[in-house]
UniProtKB/Swiss-Prot annotation:
Required for vacuolar biogenesis and for trafficking of hydrolase precursors to the vacuole. Mediates transport at the vacuolar membrane where it may be responsible for tethering transport vesicles on the target membranes. It is required for gluconeogenic growth of yeast. Acts as a component of the HOPS complex that acts during the docking stage of vacuole fusion. HOPS is an effector for the vacuolar Rab GTPase YPT7 and is required for vacuolar SNARE complex assembly. It remains bound to SNARE complexes after vacuole fusion. The lineage of its organism: Eukaryota, Fungi, Dikarya, Ascomycota, Saccharomycotina. Residues 644-653 have a biased composition (Basic and acidic residues). This is E3 ubiquitin-protein ligase PEP5. Residues 637-656 are annotated as: Disordered. It comes from the Eukaryota. It comes from Saccharomyces cerevisiae (strain ATCC 204508 / S288c) (Baker's yeast). Its main location: membrane. One of its GO terms (cellular component) is cytosol. Signal peptide: none annotated. Its EC number is 2.3.2.27. A zinc finger (RING-type) spans 928-973.
Length: 1029
């Protein structure tokens, strides 16, 4: 491969540094006597000048900081090397004398020739052949020296500690070809050697009997300086005319073709880069005579990247290369080229960022990505390269390839910008949409998508008719919004999804688009997995897939509240499509027997269950026949015998809802409505529901029966009327039961009575004016008189209502109140019932005498309309005022007498309890109240007026004063104990609030709480006296 075919970049920086003392007296590395050089660190250079003088040059100071004579005058230094930054190794030769290797410690360099750390004298006879190459191990334990006569000497020993060494000849070339390359591997167990015709491998740890362990290349050898060693890979690099070969310590070889016919020197820069020096011939530009024209030799410097097959640096040096050496700083390799003109070229790799920018400028993005990967560039920087590459490809019109690059840089690219490129700026052709879909897929799979991204992806998939893509989305995108590589099957039972606030995409919009694209089954699967609203799934099953049976099965699998919600919304539609199955489910829900079932529906499998038998729908006229048929045919899980048996003795887990919420669904289904209402009524007693709700069912069922009696076939008219009569009788019983039970609310069935009166086939409708009230009452002994009267006010004559009032007014207390409001509601009604006299006699007089209404309520009732005049109640008001005046006077007299009596008792009590005033006790002609004998001292006088002999009384010790005698009046003892009991009772009333609460909440107390409160106040509930009687 020719060099011209390799891509070239300037990825290294070359800085020529001329000797700052060039042309002066104290030359540094431009000294013409310079014979060897080595580097310690980027700031310290060691050179050998004048054959045997070693100088330490500080490059940053441009001065020699130390120098000394290292060898005798007849020796010349030909080799310098720094080992591990600790030792300096110098090799010097002298014709006719053994060559010397001296080791110095860098921290203790000598000042004169005789001082050194250790020395090795090469045993090479009279040393008539000069040394060509030297290699030293990193620990100074092994040194190999090659000569131009083909001899190799191996030196082993503890040289770093100056403990002696041994040396032996490991090879002598039979053809006396010079040793052109010699390198020890990293652990000094093997030595690579090369002559001008062969490449050899020696084992340094054993006896090789003067023969190589392995001949690596028997056909080609190396020129001097055309071999190097790569410590990073532990490989020997051989630069041949057409190849560059790499050998490992085991002899394995790999190579690549490279045209280096004018090679001159090779040096390993780092793991992947090799510096090569080649010669080029140029024509001088001086204006001298033609005869004096001669070719000019110049050196071209290449740094090749053996890994990526590129040229990383290319420049020309017009002078000879004296030596090449390297060091490192901050992890960066620094290579130095020392030339004969006193210029030292400092070669360093450019920063990775600069290298990549140089490559990007040449639009070689794949190589830039490759280089970034090799050097472990940060992920964000790599993504920036992908972004630039994507922009480049997009401009070139390679949309698919650009999309692939944008997918690789999701963290640095502006998502809206990419979407705009493929969706807005571009014509929405299928290819652009597919590219946009690929990009959106990558957002989702990397969990950086937002709600709009997921929505847009589904829209694109729908537009592309990509059924497989939508199916993949449903299978792998779970209910937590996370993409999974495997198919997600276990999150459908995760109920926490329904209580979360997750909203991954616009489900309503996607379902609408699927509906327009006729993706029926996919829309169901999508809604089943991601919809939190069961109504959406039912709508798809019912209206899109037209599968009411499966819709009912799905509704059965929901909790009771969701089931009820679906039934309220779709029961009308379900009753039209599948009436019996729907009715069975409604009965189960509204009778408290519903329990959710499992739902595993295969949309591809035909469901054979349902309401169809030989394409004819069965119609039922009662709940009993419906229940028997469903059991016998096994068409409903809800009504099966096993289900009925399991629910027979089982308490409901929820309170059945009011059936009235689905009444509107049965508008066109009267027979199904009959079955539903009868089922609800049959199970009503089991759940102790409200009587008002039961009355609603009775009223609705009654009206339904009467309507069917008018509109159904003649064969069933009598049955409907018979059922209506039974429902009316049951309603009257309910009204009577509620009226007799004081704890429950009253039940109003007036609407049923109104329906009965309005029914065209009832007896009352045929002759309204001849209604026989007595007969009606006899037929309905448990009827609600108040509801009946209200119903009569709507359909009967006022005179008929008055007759009803005369007959039942004394039985129902509120009947007179309702009648009074009715008779004065309209002037025509007032006139027809008889006017003022009849109202006074038949209505007002019974109210006043029976005290059914306060006078104020009577006045309010009459004043609501302008029918009644003041003269109607004038006499009543006058009589009331007189009665009240008489009552007031009587109460005033009672107050005066009570006040006088209270004052007398207070005075007497005050005198009695006053112990400080002396009390005069008359003893003359007094007898003892106990023995009835004449009194003689000592006596005991009580303030109640009773007096006794002291010996006639029983003595008791005072609990407060032990020395004081305590006596109690025998005659007043009973009254005293009674007073004490009353006093204790008052204390108990004050301290025990639960007594008051119990009294207020009792049946009697709840009727008149004011009476309970006043009674407790009278018993001293607020305050009490501490006076001891």
């Amino acid at each position: 491969m020719s060099l011209s075919s390799w891509r070239q970049f300037q990825l290294f920086e070359n800085i020529p540094i001329r000797d700052p003392n060039f042309g002066g007296d104290s030359l540094l590395y431009s000294d013409p006597t310079l014979c060897a050089a080595t580097i310690v660190d980027p700031q310290t250079l060691i050179i050998a000048v004048n054959s045997n003088i070693i100088k330490v040059v500080k490059l940053n100071q441009s001065q020699v900081i130390h120098e000394f004579q290292s060898f005798p005058h007849d020796f010349q230094i030909t080799f310098l090397k720094v080992i591990n930054g600790e030792f300096l190794v110098a090799l010097a030769e002298s014709i006719g004398k053994p060559s010397l290797i001296r080791v110095y410690k860098l921290e203790k360099l000598p000042n004169r020739e005789q001082l050194y750390h250790s020395q090795v004298e090469l045993k090479n006879g009279n040393n008539t052949y000069p040394i060509s190459v030297v290699s030293i191990s990193n620990d100074l334990s092994c040194i190999v020296v090659g000569f131009i006569n083909g001899k190799i000497i191996l030196i082993r020993g503890d040289i770093s500690r100056d403990r002696g060494s041994q040396q032996r000849i490991i090879y002598e070339d039979p053809s006396k070809e010079p040793i052109t390359a010699l390198f020890l591997n990293n652990d000094a167990t093997a030595c690579f050697a090369a002559t001008t015709s062969r490449i050899l491998l020696f084992n340094t740890t054993g006896r090789n009997r003067g023969r190589p362990s392995l001949v690596l290349n028997s056909k080609n050898g190396l020129d001097l300086n055309c071999g190097s060693f790569n410590p990073a890979t532990n490989e020997f690099i051989c630069c041949l005319s057409n190849f560059i070969e790499f050998f490992s310590s085991s002899g394995k070889k790999h190579q690549f073709a490279f045209d280096l016919s004018l090679r001159k020197r090779i040096f390993c820069v780092d793991k992947d880069h090799i510096l090569i020096v080649t010669e080029e011939t140029g024509v001088p530009t001086t204006s001298i005579s033609v005869n004096e024209l001669s070719p000019t030799i110049i050196n071209r410097i290449f740094i090749i990247d053996a890994k990526n097959k590129i040229i990383s640096l290319n420049f020309v040096v017009s002078s000879a290369i004296i030596d090449i050496f390297s060091t490192s700083q901050s992890g960066k390799n620094i290579t130095y080229l020392l030339t004969s003109e006193g210029v030292m070229h400092r070669i360093t790799p450019k920063s990775l960022e600069n290298q990549i920018n140089i490559i990007i400028q040449k639009e070689l993005y794949p190589f830039a990505l490759q280089l970034a990967k090799q050097h472990s560039l940060s992920p964000l920087d790599v993504q920036e390269i992908h972004k630039k590459y994507g922009d480049y490809l997009f401009k070139k019109g390679l949309r698919k390839e650009a999309t692939d690059q944008y997918i690789q840089c999701l963290d640095v690219v502006e998502t809206s910008e990419i979407i705009s490129k493929f969706g807005v700026k571009e014509v929405p052709d299928p290819e652009s949409m597919r590219n946009l879909a690929d990009y959106l897929w990558s957002l989702i799979k990397n969990s950086i998508s937002q709600r709009d991204h997921v929505t847009l992806l589904l829209i694109v998939l729908i537009k592309l008719k990509d059924v497989e893509g939508i199916d993949t989305f449903i299978q792998h995108f779970d209910r937590k919004g996370i993409w999974n590589e495997g198919v997600v099957m276990d999150d459908m039972d995760d109920v926490t999804f329904f209580y979360s606030d997750n909203d991954f995409f616009d489900l309503d919009l996607i379902l609408e688009l699927m509906k327009e694209s006729d993706f029926k089954r996919l829309s169901y699967r999508l809604a089943k997995k991601y919809s939190k609203d069961s109504l959406i799934i039912v709508d798809i099953l019912l209206n899109l897939l037209h599968n009411p049976v499966k819709a009912i099965k799905y509704i059965k699998s929901l909790p009771i509240d969701e089931t009820l919600r679906c039934l309220v919304t779709y029961s009308k539609k379900l009753l039209e499509e599948s009436p019996n199955e729907t009715n069975a489910l409604l009965i189960e829900v509204f009778t408290g027997k519903f329990k959710p079932s499992t739902f595993e529906v295969d949309l591809d499998r035909r469901d054979t269950t349902g309401d169809f038998s030989e394409n004819i729908r069965t119609v039922f006229y009662s709940y009993k026949t419906f229940f028997n048929y469903m059991n016998s045919n096994g068409t409903s899980d809800a009504m099966s015998e096993s289900s009925e048996a399991s629910h027979e003795h089982e308490e409901p887990t929820y309170h059945p809802p009011k059936p009235s919420i689905v009444f509107s669904s049965f508008v066109t289904k009267p027979f199904e409505f009959v079955v539903f209402l009868e089922a609800c009524l049959a199970c009503y007693q089991q759940y102790e529901g409200f009587d008002e709700d039961r009355q609603v069912i009775l009223t609705t069922l009654y009206d339904l029966y009467l309507n069917l009696a008018q509109n159904d076939v003649p064969e069933r008219i009598d049955d409907w009327r018979s059922r209506a009569t039974g429902v009316l009788r049951e309603s009257n019983k309910l009204v009577y039961s509620a009226a007799s039970n004081n704890t429950s609310k009253r039940v109003d069935n007036s609407i049923m009575l109104l329906i009965s009166h309005m029914d065209q086939s009832s007896a009352s409708a045929k002759d309204k004016t001849k209604i026989d009230i007595a007969s009606f009452a006899n037929d309905n002994p448990e009827m609600d008189l108040l509801s009946t009267f209200r119903a009569m006010t709507l359909n009967e004559e006022p005179s008929t209502c008055l007759k009803f009032l005369e007959k039942y007014g004394t039985e129902e207390p509120k009947l007179l109140q309702v009648a009074l409001s009715y008779f004065v509601s309209n002037k025509l009604i007032f006139k027809e019932m008889g006017g003022n006299e009849v109202l006074k006699e038949k209505v007002l007089r019974p109210i006043i005498e029976g005290e059914r209404m306060p006078l104020l309520d009577i006045i309010k009732a009459l004043s609501r309309t302008n029918v009644a005049h003041f003269g109607l109640i004038q006499d009543i008001i006058i009589d009331h005022v007189k009665t009240e005046d008489t009552e007031i006077k009587r109460n005033e007299k009672l107050i005066e007498s009570y006040d006088k009596e209270l004052k007398e008792k207070n005075k007497k009590l005050k005198n009695t309890i006053n112990s400080d005033q002396p009390l005069h006790v008359p003893l003359k002609n007094q007898t003892c109240f106990m023995c009835r004998l004449t009194l003689d001292i000592p006596v005991v006088f009580f303030k109640c007026g009773h007096i006794y002999h002291q010996h006639c009384l029983n003595e008791e010790e005072d609990t407060l004063e032990s020395e004081r005698k305590l006596f109690k009046c025998p005659k007043c003892l009973v009254d005293l104990e009674t007073s004490n009991k009353l006093f204790e009772a008052q204390h108990e009333v004050v301290e025990k609030n639960d007594l008051l609460n119990f009294a207020l909440n009792s049946e009697e107390g709840s009727r008149d709480r004011f009476k309970v409160i006043t009674e407790f106040l009278g018993r001293g509930a607020i305050s009490y006296s501490d006076i001891t009687i």
